[in-house]
Regions:
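Conserved nucleotide-sensing/catalytic segment adjacent to the nucleotide-binding pocket
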Residues: 2-34
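Acidic, Mg2+-coordinating active-site environments of NTP-dependent enzymes
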Residues: 24-26, 48-167
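Conserved helix/coil segment N-terminal to the catalytic DExD/H
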Residues: 37-44
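Short beta->alpha connector loops
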Residues: 34-37, 93-94
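Short hydrophobic/charged patches on amphipathic alpha-helices used for structural packing
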Residues: 18-19, 40, 75
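Alpha-helix initiation/capping motif
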Residues: 3, 7-10, 41, 63-66, ...
């Protein structure tokens, strides 16, 4: 067990952790890479098979100063993919176009004109029911999380796993 001070550890510790995971037989790593880490090159040398963008908020403006700087830091993750790789993008976020790079296989999530189309969702105090379509099929599901942002988080995670080949 390690206690980490940052969402994304410093480069040396991160590489140590990845090597240790590989030694234990780990085939996949799912990690959050913070905008601070991208700005400070903590993931230097790593390439990602899949990346995701859910939203851009005012959260880290104390560090980045402007939304433009914040978006540019996050965009670095989308530039660190190997070849044409999967990029899951929340099309309903007003900044989504900044992350839609031609060299990536962009898959959009949204309420209008998206690859993963959110048809409907309803929130209760215990769960969220979601109806969405993907590749001409309609799906109904329920998650034990509330908040409209969790609709996007769930569908993003679902698509990342699906694109890795899991059903």
């Amino acid at each position: 067990k390690r206690l980490l001070n940052n969402t994304t550890p410093d480069t040396d510790l991160l590489y140590d952790m990845l090597l240790e995971a590989k030694e234990y037989g780990c085939e996949y790593v799912v990690m959050e890479v913070s905008s601070h880490a991208l700005d400070k090159n903590r993931v230097f040398g790593l390439e990602f098979d899949e990346v995701a963008f859910t939203n851009l908020t005012q959260d880290h403006l104390d560090y980045h100063k402007t939304l433009e700087n914040y978006a540019n830091a996050k965009r670095k993750l989308f530039e660190k993919t190997r070849g044409e790789k999967v990029a899951i993008i929340n099309k309903d976020d007003p900044h989504h176009e900044k992350f839609m790079l031609n060299e990536n296989k962009n898959i959009t999530i949204g309420k209008n004109d998206a690859d993963v189309l959110i048809k409907n969702y309803s929130l209760s105090h215990l769960h969220t029911k979601i109806q969405f379509s993907y590749e001409d099929k309609i799906y109904d599901t329920q998650i034990n999380m509330v908040g409209s942002y969790n609709v996007y988080n769930y569908l993003t995670a679902l698509m990342l796993v699906h694109k890795l080949g899991f059903s």
